[in-house]
Amino acid sequence: MYPAHLLVLLAVCVSLLGASDMPPQPLNLVQFSNMIQCANHGRRPTSNYMDYGCYCGKGGSGTPVDELDRCCKIHDDCYGEAEKSQKCAPYWTWYTWKCGSDGPQCDDSETGSRRFVCGYDATAAKCFAKAPYNKENYNIETRCQ
């Protein structure tokens, strides 16, 4: 490959990186997203959960609107508890897990914060998979005050 071609390729790659409107995700959220896909067997994209109800996605307030939103509130509360009592950073905690026939399973060798966060994520992912998804509850922050 000619040096000029390499420069053009590099320029394209750099411009694509700058054009991305998605902020970098904490490592754990990537794992959690994969767990959700494992639990629901790919039936629903993870993006459907990013702005659902009052608690699915960043932050949360008000009263959960349904069973799925309650799953998100419980998960948020668990992360808050992990930050306080376990003194860990759940959004950045990396753990080992596998996708089994009955959903995500945490590696038994994990201990401490890794075990707690993996357990919270696996439980939430299974809860998401069981809960009905109501399209009317997507992007409703005005009802969550």
UniProtKB/Swiss-Prot annotation:
GO CC annotation terms, alphabetical: extracellular region
Record propeptide residues: 20-27
List of catalytic residues: H75, D121
Catalysed reaction, written as an equation: a 1,2-diacyl-sn-glycero-3-phosphocholine + H2O = a 1-acyl-sn-glycero-3-phosphocholine + a fatty acid + H(+)
Residues where Ca(2+) binds: Y55, G57, G59, D76
Expression by tissue: Expressed by the venom gland.
Extent of the signal sequence: 1-19
Residue runs in coiled coils: none
GO MF term list: calcium ion binding; calcium-dependent phospholipase A2 activity; phospholipid binding; toxin activity
Superkingdom in the source lineage: Eukaryota
Pfam family membership, one: Phospholip_A2_1
Cofactor details (free text): Binds 1 Ca(2+) ion.
Similarity comment text for this entry: Belongs to the phospholipase A2 family. Group I subfamily. D49 sub-subfamily.
Role of this protein: Snake venom phospholipase A2 (PLA2) that inhibits collagen-induced platelet aggregation. PLA2 catalyzes the calcium-dependent hydrolysis of the 2-acyl groups in 3-sn-phosphoglycerides.
Record's protein name: Acidic phospholipase A2 S1-11
Species this chain originates from: Austrelaps superbus
